[in-house]
């Protein structure tokens, strides 16, 4: 500005942010009109750098440990002030946004970023309300300063970067990291703490609605198919990653999608493919010499992403909400090749598998994870984002399933016929056929076969799916080896579940070790 004070852009529009980002060298335009930005060495979340301020109003409700690490209040205040001082002479971008598409349960947020592209990401992923904060709630402050370098000895951080949540002061501080996914996941963690106190279940899931108004939820870790399977050309999308389930309905916590791009194809994922256009942020995607994105190129990371607003999707629920779900799908990526492609779960089995969260890290979103695929147990299908003890969420899930009568299914999007490296992965058309049968209600009350070792009930037929695939033992050439792997998997479930204090009815609902 003329007087030398740096400019602050308030509620800037996408075109303006893209122009500024290009002029400042923050990114480049692709042939399809999207803005490509690179995040440097951190191409995923940094769980070791995430903290929660330990203070009286929330400390007794938080499950402290390796996921939720405590940070001292005084150290937080000093660091927040230091970052504010650092931003004092910078051109800044500020937006008033909301998290939670529900009049009773939204949180108003003010997002301040050092870069134009991070502001574009925030405006794509959070909700841009017609009227900001209509219920006049206290506003959360988010500061994102990727250019600030933390000094662990001075700041009390783990490295040169940090993410810190402060529930008492309603503040989120992101310093020293460019990976934009940290912004959305930090506000997800905030809602995951706040919503259960109101009897609302926060969920790491995607959601869509059929033409008859029937809602389906898809739970799963990154890379298991949440975004791909919910982006269904025959159904209306509510959202692809974060939702709340309140008595009476399901609402999106966000206003956009953050889709994985690795090996993205127009044939298999037309909805996502068509959403990538002007206004979209492509994160760590490599382009060829003609500026055409090469989604097969994982030179920068397996975790390349597209961040776009829900408006980029033609078939969507404009109000970001839906009725309570008739069907709930737990997506698991089984690297051992043991689990069936679909199982029908009882209420107790649903609680067991929700707490277990068995799956694989596929193209993991975490820093430093190798491209090697390994199995993992991630509580509630999203352990890194849930501040309260796991039982709180499992209890809420059972309550909601029971009161509405939702049917829960376990769907394996991983391997069959042998473990990873030997067997083959279920292809997307097979999984889509299973999901089609689930959402149409064709698997309700069907004849099932009980797989004793896994303690799972498997339908004997699914329209559009080869019958031989339904019982996994049929796909293994070596039946004895299958039995061995099934035993190992059952044992690992049992060992993992020992930490949970739950009723026997849930404890005995898992595989038989």
From Swiss-Prot:
ATP binds at residues 185, 204, 220-228, 269, 305, 431. Binds 1 Mn(2+) ion per subunit. Its main location: cytoplasm. Its EC number is 4.1.1.49. Mn(2+) binds at residues 185, 204, 241. Belongs to the phosphoenolpyruvate carboxykinase (ATP) family. This is Phosphoenolpyruvate carboxykinase (ATP). It comes from Shewanella woodyi (strain ATCC 51908 / MS32).
